Structures are given as structure tokens and as C-alpha cells.
Amino acid sequence: MNPLIIKLGGVLLDSEEALERLFTALVNYREAHQRPLIIVHGGGCVVDELMKQLNLPVKKKNGLRVTPADQIDIITGALAGTANKTLLAWAKKHGISSVGLFLGDGDSVKVTQLDAELGHVGLAQPGSPALINTLLAGGYLPVVSSIGVTDEGQLMNVNADQAATALAATLGADLILLSDVSGILDGKGQRIAEMTAEKAEQLIEQGIITDGMIVKVNAALDAARALGRPVDIASWRHAEQLPALFNGTPIGTRILA
């Protein structure tokens, strides 16, 4: 089977119960299947907490975090440091051999500046699969933070959904976006099983899909188009369903190309 990228989002990193459920599901899945897995993560909650402690402002534009030059070092420390190593620690606790990476390692994902108004925010594009394929062949679980670096050596904060999409394109991998929500909800709060670009545009126009979920849906649509196959948005809350999800059974919203 193709490698599978599991993008972790939401408050997952803040919840020991959620991490325990996730890594138990990963162990169970890896014992029963040979499919290579890769984790890609952001860590907005970790960054927000740190910003609060340092009395620094948090500003967003169209769901993307504005990252001034005087904040990129702090955000890099939170994402490539604290968030990444927290996940490695959980992997270690569960007996999974893992390697912590950022997007620039092995040039796995190419990054350029997205928009000068956003500051150190990067646009992710496919890079080289060589390093991660080597790690997968060795039986390792790569855990990749959404910090990248430009060819000019500038650190960039990349939206983790978009980073995961670029890495999936690099590796020819399938993609699951795991978050706090069970999928995309309609106006009545009911989960939508399948979503097309046309349906997504309607719900955005109607104000049903808003803010960060717009970024998530657009990232999933971009991924589905780039990869030529569906992308799943699902919740990490139902651990018992995760092995089935990792094996290709939809449990949230399946985004169609």
C-alpha cells in the first residue's frame, strides 16, 4: 500500500488522553499492517500558550497565523521543539522507533514565503522523498513538524494541513487530516460523509464553513486534486475507529478530487 500521512491538529497535543488513544491505535495498526506511516503536525495550541506566557499578540489573517520576524524563533521552538519532541516521547513510551524532522530535512518539502504581509509564513511544495523513504525502509516512524526553510535560509511557519499535502505529493502518500471535529458538519451539525469542491464552495458562501475550517477544507481539496485520490478529514477522539481509518475506511468526511 501507499504510505499514509496522518496529520495531527487541534488540541491533540494538549490532551494526554487523546495522545494515549492515538499512539495505542498506531501500535495496534503497525502490528497488524505493513503500511508505512508518517506523522505531520502543527501545534497551534502550544504556540498560543507560549505567546500568552510571553505577552505577545496572536494575529491571524484568513485563518493563517501572522508570523513577524521577532516571533519566528519562538514559533520554531514551540513546533519543531516542544510539540515535535512531545510526540517523539509518546512514540518512545509506546515502543515505536521514531525520528523527529522538520520540512527542510532532506529537502523533503520545498518552502517559499507565501505573502510578505503574513511575515515568516511559508508556501509548501513537493520536495525530495529520499530521506523519508530511507527512514520508512528502516522501519522508523517519521514525525515531521510544519516548520520549513527557504533556499535563502529563512525559517518559515507553514500551515500544517498544507505541509502535509505537500509531503503527501512528495511521497505519493495517502492523507488523513485528524482534528478535533469528526468531519465537516452541515448547517444542522450533522457530519457530511463526502464533500466535493462544489459542495464546499456552497457551504463557504452560506457561512457554514468558516475560519480555520476553510483552510482545512481547501487544503484537503488541494491534496485530493494534487494526489488524484480522496483525502479524509476525521477526529482522533474515537480511537477504536482509527485502525479502520488508517486502512482506508472513511469515518469522517471524505474529500473528493
Swiss-Prot record:
Alphabetic keyword roster: Amino-acid biosynthesis, Arginine biosynthesis, ATP-binding, Cytoplasm, Kinase, Nucleotide-binding, Transferase
GO terms of biological process kind: arginine biosynthetic process via ornithine; L-arginine biosynthetic process
Site residues (Transition state stabilizer), renumbered to this chain: K7, K216
Superkingdom of origin organism: Bacteria
Enzyme Commission designation: 2.7.2.8
Subcellular location: Cytoplasm
Keyword Kinase among record annotations: yes
Sites where the protein binds ATP: D180, V181, S182, G183, I184, L185, I208, I209, T210
Gene3D superfamilies, per database record: Acetylglutamate kinase-like (3.40.1160.10)
Record-listed substrate binding positions: G43, G44, R65, N157
Keyword Protein transport tagged: no
GO cellular component: cytoplasm
Stretches that traverse the bilayer: none
Gene Ontology terms for molecular function: acetylglutamate kinase activity; ATP binding
Pathway: Amino-acid biosynthesis; L-arginine biosynthesis; N(2)-acetyl-L-ornithine from L-glutamate: step 2/4
Broad class of where this protein is predominantly found: cytoplasm
PANTHER family cross-referenced by the UniProt entry: N-ACETYLGLUTAMATE SYNTHASE, N-ACETYLGLUTAMATE SYNTHASE, MITOCHONDRIAL
Similarity remark: Belongs to the acetylglutamate kinase family. ArgB subfamily.
Protein purpose: Catalyzes the ATP-dependent phosphorylation of N-acetyl-L-glutamate.
Subunit architecture: Homodimer.
Protein name (database record): Acetylglutamate kinase
Species in which this protein is naturally found: Klebsiella pneumoniae (strain 342)
Gene encoding the protein: argB
